[in-house]
Curated annotation (Swiss-Prot):
GO molecular function: cellulase activity
Keywords: Carbohydrate metabolism, Cell membrane, Cell wall biogenesis/degradation, Cellulose degradation, Glycoprotein, Glycosidase, Hydrolase, Membrane, Polysaccharide degradation, Signal-anchor, Transmembrane, Transmembrane helix
Top EC class of this enzyme: hydrolase
Extracellular face residues: 92-620
InterPro entries: 6-hairpin_glycosidase_sf, 6hp_glycosidase-like_sf, Glyco_hydro_9, Glyco_hydro_9_Asp/Glu_AS, Glyco_hydro_9_His_AS
Upper classification of the organism: Eukaryota, Viridiplantae, Streptophyta, Embryophyta, Tracheophyta
Domain of life according to the entry: Eukaryota
Gene expressing this chain: KOR3
Organism: Arabidopsis thaliana (Mouse-ear cress)
Annotated protein name in UniProt: Endoglucanase 21
Record topology, Cytoplasmic segments: 1-70
A biological-process GO annotation: cell wall organization
Tissue: Expressed in conductive tissues of young roots, cotyledons, rosette leaves, cauline leaves and sepals. Expressed in the leaf trichome support cells.
Any one of the GO CC terms: plasma membrane
Membrane topology: Single-pass type II membrane protein
Basic and acidic residues: compositionally biased ranges: 21-39
Length: 620
């Protein structure tokens, strides 16, 4: 039988397959009746059923917690991949050649800084501390200072620093030296830290301030006397008694009684300078609150003493006038008052130092040949810059702005005078500025000027000021740094003699320094006058007094390395302090940073600007 294929073409149908649905149903019923009626055992069931499908667990039992299976597998996979990747990276790193990145070598100024600080260790008096900075040929000395005269007010004057090539302790230049070191630390602590010398310089400052606190009644609010000098340098008729200039001997071998000079009144310059030293050091040691507080109290007491009976400490032909004669005292009052304001924040000091009268008395409006020559005697240029700092960073406004603006302008004029274009100061053919107008021992003044110029440059840069005006001409801060570098480079050896004037720096430096301790072998004990054979010797010093900046060349760039001529070869505390300050200002990379703007103002509260007086009534 054929049917029609709906897609086209015949379709053959087998007749045997044409049973009806009823027939199929009856056949199935017959099959069901043939099925055994008893239940199947498990084995038989397994023949008929497929394998049992087990449902996967969604969690993993870790004993103490249940974790999602997906999270567990993902975490495990991540750990495995990370471990493989880490191992691969480690293998690569180990197989690659290693390039060790060493720190860049220190610059010349940093090297010279480390050397220059050693001079202060060589000048220490008293029972020396045991530390890494000790000088091998120096030992305890002058342990009886202040103890031999029952008439002295202060019985313990052990400590401090010897001034130069002798063993006298002059408190006036010593105070100035400590102030300079403190100022440089306040401004450039990061650079000292980078050079590895911060703790060293702080120890040197504290050695000085600890001694100063012994030289007056530092616990009192008011005093009537202070020590100005320990030791004597009197020469000429009547000087046959043993003293520090009559004898040439190591300080360790001094056996004679050392005189103590005291000032009972008219000590304005000395007291104000020592107040500056203590006040500035109190900022350096501000984290040592008790010590800083003691320094501030002592500074206040000294400044009060300085303002009660005003006059020069070296007047009336005193011995100090032969060595460190102070030309005036008002500049110290300005200088010390500025430091006390920064140390205390007391506006009474600010009002004093910004008065027109005090500035005029200090010579701020003058134009002497030595205007701008910063030294142990003339603090005016330092005070002007110190107060300019306040105007640049605090802008206190009325009523201080007028005088602070004057100080700012005066500082600018001083900096102009340092530039070679204005010829206020001559220069040697080798380029050394003659700030003391051709007189001997020029380097201490040069180092001080180099410090002021570098510092003013950093002040301007920190205040986002690119330069300053000299009349109609504008100069960038780089002119200041070039001046500073040129003068310090001269001192370090870039001069016609190709000689460093800092002992221990460079290949060529003075070998016959005018210095008692350095000129006598350390194991040789000489009598008072027996040591003069070493002074007159043509041989080099047996002990190198590393870091000492000698007095320097003459106005023709000439220099004689002769021990007997102190105008060429004697170093001083004041000179080395200026050198250290200039070196740290120039040292290091720009990345180390410039000045620390804020530490100086750590004790200064926010200033409330006063309301200026109303203008005078207008009249037609």
């Amino acid at each position: 039988m054929y049917g029609r294929d709906p897609w086209g073409g015949p379709l053959e149908i087998n007749a045997a397959d044409s049973m009806t649905d009823d027939d199929r149903s009856r056949n199935l019923q017959d099959l069901d009746r043939a099925t055994p009626s008893r239940p199947l055992d498990e084995t038989q069931q397994s023949w008929l059923l497929g394998p049992k499908v087990l449902k996967k667990k969604k969690y993993v039992d870790l004993g103490c917690i249940l974790v999602s299976r997906k999270i567990f597998l993902w975490t495990l996979g991540t750990i495995v991949v990370t471990a493989l990747l880490s191992g691969f990276i480690t293998l690569i790193v180990k197989t690659l050649p290693h390039h060790h990145h060493k720190e860049p070598p220190p610059d010349n100024y940093t090297i010279a800084l480390r050397t220059a600080l050693k001079f202060f260790n060589a000048q220490q008096s008293g029972k020396l501390p045991k530390n890494i900075y000790n000088v091998s040929w120096r030992h305890d000395s002058c342990l009886q200072d202040g103890k031999g005269d029952p008439g002295q007010c202060y019985k313990d004057l052990v400590g401090g620093y010897y001034d130069a090539g002798d063993s006298i302790k002059f408190n006036f230049p010593m105070s100035y030296a400590m102030t300079m070191l403190s100022w440089s630390v306040i401004e450039y602590s990061a650079k000292y830290q980078a050079a590895g010398e911060l703790e060293h310089v702080k120890e040197l400052i504290k050695w000085g301030t600890d001694y100063f606190l012994k030289t007056f009644n530092s616990s009192a609010d008011n005093i009537y006397v202070m020590v100005e000098q320990v030791g004597s340098g009197v020469s000429g008729r009547g000087s046959e008694l043993h003293n520090d200039h009559y004898c040439w001997m190591r300080p360790e071998d001094i056996h004679y009684k050392r005189t103590v000079s005291q000032c009972y009144s008219s000590c304005s310059d000395l007291a104000a300078e020592m107040a500056a030293a203590l006040a500035s050091a109190s900022i350096v040691f501000k984290d040592n609150r008790l010590y800083s507080k003691n320094l501030v109290h002592g500074a206040k007491t000294l400044y009060r003493f300085a303002t009660t009976s005003r006059n020069r400490y070296s007047q009336n032909g005193k011995e100090s006038s032969k060595f460190y004669n102070s030309s005036m005292f008002e500049d110290e009052l300005l200088w010390g008052g500025a430091w006390l304001y920064y140390a205390t924040g007391n506006v009474t000091y600010l009002e004093r130092v910004t008065s027109h009268h005090m500035a005029e008395k200090a010579g701020a409006f003058g134009n002497s040949p030595y205007y701008g020559v910063f030294s142990w005697d003339n603090k005016l240029p330092g005070a002007q810059l110190l107060l300019t700092r306040m105007r640049l960073f605090l802008s206190p406004g009325y009523p201080y702005e007028d005088m602070l603006s004057e100080f700012h302008n005066q500082t600018g004029r001083v900096m102009c005078s340092y530039l070679p274009y204005y010829k206020k100061f001559n220069r040697t053919n080798g380029g050394l500025i003659q700030l003391n107008h051709g007189a001997p021992q020029p380097l201490q003044y040069v180092a001080n000027a180099a410090f002021l110029a570098a510092l003013f440059s950093d002040y301007l840069e920190a205040a986002d000021t690119p330069g300053w005006y000299c009349g109609p001409n504008f100069y960038t801060t780089e002119f200041l740094r070039n001046f500073s570098r040129s003068q310090i480079d001269y001192i370090l050896g870039k001069n016609p003699r190709k000689m460093s004037y800092v002992v221990g720096y460079g290949q060529r430096y003075p070998k016959q320094v005018h210095h008692r301790g350095a000129s006598i072998p350390k194991n040789m004990k000489e009598t008072c006058t027996g040591g003069f054979k070493w002074k007159k010797s043509k041989k080099n010093n047996p002990n190198a007094i590393n870091g000492a900046m000698v007095a320097g060349p003459d106005k023709h760039d000439g220099f004689h390395d002769i021990r007997t001529n102190y105008n060429y070869t004697e170093p001083t505390l004041a000179g080395n302090a200026g050198l250290v300050a200039a070196l740290v200002a120039l040292s290091g990379e720009k990345a180390v940073g410039g000045i620390d703007k804020n530490t100086m103002f750590s004790a200064v509260p926010p200033l409330v600007m006063a309301t200026p007086p109303p203008p005078a009534p207008w009249t037609p």
